[in-house]
Each structure stands twice: as structure tokens, then as C-alpha cells.
Amino acid sequence: MYHVIAATTNPAKIKAISLAFDDVFGPGTYRIEDINVDSSVPQQPIGNTETRTGARQRVMAARQVRPEADFWVGVEAGIEDDMTFAWMVVEYQQIRGESRSASLMLPEKILDGIREGRELGHEMAYLTGIDNINQKEGAIGFFTDGILTRTSVYHQALILALVPVHHEIYKELNAR
């Protein structure tokens, strides 16, 4: 059974990790341990580079805390221009897979708060009245009326981040 470290305590992100591992490796083949680690970037990362760095740093920190695990997974959400998105980083042994999620264009009212230094989750909770919306459906779920959720969008990106770990062609290339 794989020991998977989720470098997050956010239930929406943990659910996405679980769904991706179910799809790629099968239910019952892993156990997820969530841990709280620092991303070494601001609470609300701005830009592609800062957000990707946050996901990578989470994995690096998780490996230091739980070096005996099989997988380490970092998920970092960020803002670029007028959109929210996230980076997924998965490491297994010396193999790393990365993927960026789909993006959602945010309304100016939300962006104004972010420009003033507040987090997207805070702005969404204020706008919607939903406490901890960032740990539930997120902005994605709210603005798509539940057609997509934070979990469903991250689930897809996590499957893509797992490709270098499980696909035979990648394994052959990594063995060379």
C-alpha cells in the first residue's frame, strides 16, 4: 500500500488527491496522511512562478517531515492577472510530475480585494457568506453553480501530474 503525503490540510485538496489516486492506482492501494507544511510563498501567491514554487516547496517540506513515504503531493492555488488556478506537484522516488489546473476568470470586485492584500478565500467568504468556502467548493464551485468544483478541477490536474510516475513510456525514458 502506497503511503501518500498530502502537503495540505485543506479537505477540498485532499479529496482531489484521493480521487486522482483512486483513478490512477485504484481504491484501497494507498493511504493519505495530510500534514501542514509551509509553502515559503505568501498566503495568496501571485503569478505562475510564485504559485508553482509554493507547490514545489510544499513537496520539499513534506519530504523532510515524512521521508519514508512513497508519494508527496503539493497543491498550491494562486492568482495570475485576473484568474485563479493551481499548481500540482507529485514526487515518487526521484520522479516529479507537475500540472497546472484550468483557470477561472475572477470578477473585478474580488480582484480589488486581492490587490489590497487579502486572500481569495477571504474575499469569496465575504461575497458569498459561505464560511471556509476555500475548503469546500471554492470560487470554481460557486461561479459554475457546482458544475465544477475546486476538487474536480484539481482532480483532473492531479491525474496529469501523476502521468510521469505511472505511464510506461515515462518509466522507460527515466530508466535510461
Swiss-Prot record:
The UniProt record lists the keyword Magnesium: yes
Cofactor field: Mg(2+); Mn(2+)
Keyword Heme: no
The protein's enzyme class: hydrolase
Binding annotation for substrate: T8, T9, N10, P11, A12, K13, E68, A69
SUPFAM superfamilies according to UniProt: ITPase-like
Keywords, in A-Z order: Hydrolase, Magnesium, Manganese, Metal-binding, Nucleotide metabolism, Nucleotide-binding
Reactions this protein catalyses: XTP + H2O = XDP + phosphate + H(+); ITP + H2O = IDP + phosphate + H(+)
Organism superkingdom: Bacteria
Cofactor binding summary note: Binds 1 divalent metal cation per subunit; can use either Mg(2+) or Mn(2+).
EC number: 3.6.1.73
Family as reported in the entry's similarity comment: Belongs to the YjjX NTPase family.
Record function comment: Phosphatase that hydrolyzes non-canonical purine nucleotides such as XTP and ITP to their respective diphosphate derivatives. Probably excludes non-canonical purines from DNA/RNA precursor pool, thus preventing their incorporation into DNA/RNA and avoiding chromosomal lesions.
HAMAP family: Non_canon_purine_NTPase_YjjX (MF_00648)
UniProt-recorded name of the protein: Inosine/xanthosine triphosphatase
Organism, as annotated: Photorhabdus laumondii subsp. laumondii (strain DSM 15139 / CIP 105565 / TT01) (Photorhabdus luminescens subsp. laumondii)
